[in-house]
């Protein structure tokens, strides 16, 4: 299964070519998965560069992180990223709350000083990249499944024929591209907006695995009403629940959640 996933990532998601360099980054790594990626990279004539990390160590580093330290890390990794043709990140965690006690001001500083130049300004526009999660007992627990059953489910959706899926998406993409008004209604949600002229993009296994959505965006000042999310969202180790946004002419004028102060921070 890892071998097939590695083929999907190398040959399809980032379409690595002979002589190209790929940065492989895995958190709480599975040696079998990393090995499969290295082997597949060599099989297509590419050059793998591997970085392995552990969430517990990352937490300790972040708790004492200074801005000067983050700047040095950013300088080194930005230079490395600029030499890469592709980037594969596989994120895994035994405890989804591992970073919950990292101070918010440090997290914000790290995002500004490190993530912005390395990932937002370099990786996103300059490399072929794909990001995915990796199955763990923690993820299985969230899905209320056994670890074995969750792993079977995970690999079955990650190893789909995404080329076939891409073709099946075309009719919906065409419909979205000619749509103007959208009205969403549901429990706690009554939202209207326009998508006229925005276009639609297929997510068919190139940037994220597993994949399968077709996305668009609203005309910026056309969004009005309220939207309430019925699923939790993990951000920097904190679990937001009952998130609700109220929009007026495209601007969020009210945001609430299980920790309203934190979400407005």
Regions from the PLM with identified roles:
Residues 1-225:
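Active-site bordering "gate/hinge" segments
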Residues 183, 242-244:
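Short, surface-exposed charged micro-motifs
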Residues 193, 245-247:
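Broad, structure-driven detector of short, well-ordered beta-strand segments within folded domains
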Residues 199-200, 233-235, 259-262:
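Short, catalytically relevant binding-site loops at active-site mouths
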Residues 219-238, 242:
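Structured beta-strand/loop patches that form or line metal/cofactor-binding pockets in enzymes
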Residues 248-265:
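C-terminal, non-catalytic macromolecule-binding modules
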